[in-house]
Amino acid sequence: YEQRYISDRLDTLVTDAQISEYYMSHQDDFVLQRPVMKVRFVDVMKDSPNKDHVLKMISSDEFDEFHRTDSITVSSALRYFDNSDVWMDARDLAAEFGVDYSQMLSAMKDNMIKIEPEGRGDLLAAYVCDIRRSGVAPLEFCAAEIRDILLSARKHALVKGLERDLLETALENRQFVIY
């Protein structure tokens, strides 16, 4: 009954303004524990004829070059993703490299991280478009978590309201028994 009650009444629309308001009033809750990054990642074979071209192009800020990179990379790379407009946790990126994030960050030179796994024929590389190492996490990084927090608070309020209403109804109808 409780689940049905909640699903029928829970307002799941969370506006950007509500997220921003919560973020601004709870910034201490969003202090970074690890760096967050915007990156372009590629896993390419060391002997690929396009390797150097792909590595050069993932670091390009030119829109035309970037689109060419997408098509060349898709055909040349074992794995590729573009998170240049989305913040990601450094630990998640480090997992792509198969190392911990401090090892990964120590391999960064001129915003490029390159790691050649031992015993494999590939090269893992990421171009770091932006990085925040400390301070308050960017709102965009926290938005999904804040949305969950706000929905959870609404759900909790609904459950409390249901419990209060049931208790009041039971007391009014003298159906409340204490054992």
Go through each PLM region and give its residues:
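Peptidyl-prolyl cis-trans isomerase
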Residues: Y1-Y179
